[in-house]
Amino acid sequence: MRPLAPLTRVALSTLLLALLLVGCAQNEPEFSVSDLPPGDPARGAEIFTEPPGGASCAHCHPLDGERSVGPPLTGYAARAAGEVSGQSAEEYTFDAILRPSKHVVRGYSNMMPGSYEDALTQQDIADLIAYLLSR
């Protein structure tokens, strides 16, 4: 087998690096907040504590205001409404669930899993948003 020419090695290395970066990038959701059905806050409360995928929101996001791994959700609706200029509380919450690295709360590291799009249905997401915005 002939050794690769230096230019070919550079091209292959560049291609492999590009593929690696694409594979590590956070995927954009295939739908937007405007595509979601109406949410049910009561069902959202159930998903918050015992989601279908098994990773409980409540484990890292306390409801009592205590500091934990993730920011507490006491008064969440008011904070979400003013967190990002030009973005509604629903859009902000949608991003927090499906694009968690987009807006990292000051004082916290982004330790949330990449996205819950594969674990939650659109109805689950709508219900969870409705619950969080009822707080």
Residue ranges, per PLM feature:
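Electrostatic cytochrome c docking/interface patches
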Residues: 25-52, 86-87
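Generic structural signal for secondary-structure transition and capping sites
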Residues: 53, 101-105
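Inter-heme linker and motif-flanking segments adjacent to c-type heme-binding CXXCH motifs
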Residues: 27-30, 66, 134-135
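The canonical Cys-X-X-Cys-His
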Residues: 44, 52-64, 128, 132
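Bacterial N-terminal signal peptides that target proteins for export
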Residues: 2-12
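Gly/Gly-Pro-rich "capping" loops immediately C-terminal to redox-active cysteine motifs
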Residues: 34, 38-41, 59-96, 114-118
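C-terminal capping alpha-helices of c-type cytochrome domains
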Residues: 91, 112-135
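C-terminal motif of bacterial Sec signal peptides marking the signal peptidase cleavage site
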Residues: 20-23
